Amino acid sequence: DPVLVGADEHIRGMPEAYLGAALELGYDELCAEADLRGALVIPAHIDRTMYGVINQLGFLPEGPYAAVEAVRPLKAGAGRGYTVVTGSDAHYPEHIARRPFSLDLPEGWQHGGVVSLDAVREALAAGRARLPFST
């Protein structure tokens, strides 16, 4: 069970609620709500054996996805035609940036040091991601 630990490394208490499932929303509801609020909805590591949506549900459900993230090349049709990106999902410092990807962004992708999510959304929709592997 998780415990609350202070800066001095001493246990300060136990959480009052189970934190393993912090949301009461289902997958479809969460994706729809994120999209409604302008987020880029990108299901993560959809191909993982543990916790990947394809292995949990048997398929990738339809959704308002800007892209999908995969650990390795996907089987034909598994990504339902969405642009595939990669990420590290690092649990150890040495795993940070081990699966980078690049994205060709359009003119005007940044304004005053702020990245335009619309520019990222446009580049993902156009399939302008370059991966460390072929899909």
Predicted regions and their residues:
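Alpha-helix-centered segments that form part of catalytic cores
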Residues: 1-36
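Charged catalytic cores and adjacent phosphate/nucleic-acid-binding surfaces used
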Residues: 1-2, 7, 18-19, 40, ...
